[in-house]
Amino acid sequence: MPRWTPLLVGITALWAASTAQAGSFDLNLGDNAIELNLAAPIAEGIAIGAGVLHSEYREDATMLHGQIMGVERNRRMDIGVGARWTQFNTDYGNGGGLGLGGYGYVYLPNAPAVSVGGYGFFTPSVATSGKLDDSFLAGARVRYDFTPTVDGYVGYRRMTADFDDQRSSRTLDNSVHVGVNLRF
């Protein structure tokens, strides 16, 4: 059993127990990576979320995150901006940090079921702990709304981190993936 499986089960159980209102479940898979994200609103326009990304791109790396975001979703756009704590457990080093970032998607006027956009988070060295110096996550996706509650997507993700014992930033994930997002 992979070492991240208990974390995945724990995050899922905590999230399921804490959400009585609408939320989302997002799962994506690539050749060398799997990611699961869960989110739930806590007030009008504010959502909390948690997730895990396990990548075997070059070395073994597991990243857990928790976030709070200001969010807005309507027929034209889907955006969120906020803070995210990311904890790294990698072959290069371990540590965590508080980053800022968000996501933004625009629905195409001539194809209203299709949206394009991306996301990014940056964690500077001033907001890190352990061996982590800084990290950067960026990605892009093309999404298709199969139903009002189900999106499918194709995306690209790149995550880098700089650790104390390394000479330069390390790429922890660099992958194309496919995924599904369920909203309930």
Model region roles, listed by residue range:
Residues 144, 171-184:
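Outer-membrane beta-barrel "beta-signal"
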Residues 1-24:
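Cleavable N-terminal export/targeting peptides
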Residues 44-50, 73-79, 110-116, 144, ...:
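Repeated loop/turn-to-beta-strand initiation elements of outer-membrane beta-barrel proteins
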Residues 18-70:
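Short glycine/proline- and aromatic-enriched beta-strand/turn motifs that initiate or cap beta-hairpins
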Residues 29-33, 52-58, 70, 83-89, ...:
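Transmembrane beta-strands of outer-membrane beta-barrel pores
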Residues 37-41, 67-71, 103-107, 141-143, ...:
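Transmembrane beta-barrel domains of outer membrane proteins
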Residues 63-109, 116:
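Hydrophobic, well-structured mid-protein blocks that either form specific transmembrane helices
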Residues 30-34, 44, 58-64, 77, ...:
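Residues that define the transmembrane beta-barrel architecture of outer-membrane proteins
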